[in-house]
């Protein structure tokens, strides 16, 4: 059994040792709910990593957005390089859900763009949690959305073993049932190809490695891992397990039962509409559902098969759908990061989904069973949680009331104090901001500015730019990858000032930022509540010179509470430093490591590395004419690129490789 192995140069310090010990004791004594109340920059992620190391429990970490999830994923990848650290977020780059607007009689068909790399990582996550114990999955709200049933999923595995009697034809049939497609021309994820008695499978959960199975009659003679692009053999295996290409799979027998269940439900629904005099709806549901049934019979799936997920899993009406949480073993640990934001987000998903789906059901676009393809209700989510740790600098009343053990982590290992807080009048906020920015730039510090509206973000950015400030803005219209890149560029000093609204709060790690400016701090509300202000002020707590300036004409209750709490923590930290002779020092994490190990950036790096594999292609590993043609095209593309870059020696080497492939396979 694989064990978690925490790799780090640092020992726990500050409040970390007592926090780790208290949380571990709580887990070992069976406490269900604990809270880690840790100030910004106190090393909460490192504390989590130590708890996982000491308890040796598989762990699901929940975050409230992709940016924070990517940061957590990259940090845990560094802490546990020898273990399975996985990433489970929405795989849609673009998503327009199916909907019907009754007022205008408008049906909007589902339209989406799936990110294949993220889809592969989701499949990799469920595979890892089913195969091994040393697994950490970092997930967003996607964790509570319907997924294929784990029991059905496990029944559809293809087990391969050297010396086993299986047969090439039987293996292909099984792969098709698992939603793999045969493609001898374009060997890509979720497909297989056959050359003589050699079967190559590109597992849907694999990023670049494929499995080669060699048969002798019906017996498996050899199994090996190959590079999917070059076909170069990487290592031999005695056995291998292939997981389905999608989470929504079922056996042939189960599909036959499902089809009968769909027909039965359709009959009842048509009867209901006809009785109500809704003949258009009756015709619509019959036509659409019969088409889906035909697709399932012919291909094994249909567009929108997730709407039949309750029938596929055999669950009763109203039962919670299977989700990622169902894939977790009983001894798993759940950590909810930034719980004061994450839990309300999870709680709000069900009702929004229900109102949209109800229209589809009421007007004959979907059967009533589609209502059970949904996110979990909050009480269902609560009931499914194993032992849980809520992590936040500002936990909400819900977590504090649930908690059987609340652990405070106020002292930072770095000795850093909470920032100084100043209040200045609103009338001078723009001019004063410009003055503070110039002072910060002179000290090579970065500046964050938070405002209340998108319009103000853009106007302020334009104003600062006109006054010679190198500035960028960040708001909800900017996609995940660009957001990560913007934060990376700020830390690198590509620009000096970042303006935003609510995207500068939880979890973002930017120790280079020394000044925070909060515009209109006295406007009571969601973005200027006590907890929001504490979180926002925390963005400059990782810098030894960190200071926050609140622009306000009156000091609101929220402002006063936030300033009092910041001062309380600052005094405790200062006393600890004096007692232990600690001098506060900014700790700068490696910027490129954090960026490069995020999933979106890994995808870019993988594409850049493909050309290196093409250059290194093993001619002896090429199977047949089709693959040879594909390799020649890739090599010719690289040759032209090298020639364009005036790298003629490399271009000549590639030309010789092309000649070698042609001589072997095409005889030219």
Swiss-Prot record:
Keywords: ATP-binding, Cytoplasm, DNA damage, DNA excision, DNA repair, Excision nuclease, Nucleotide-binding, SOS response. Residues 429-595 form the Helicase C-terminal domain. ATP binds at residues 38-45. Disulfide bonds: none annotated. Gene3D superfamilies: 6.10.140.240, P-loop containing nucleotide triphosphate hydrolases (3.40.50.300), UVR domain (4.10.860.10). Its main location: cytoplasm. Belongs to the UvrB family. This is UvrABC system protein B.
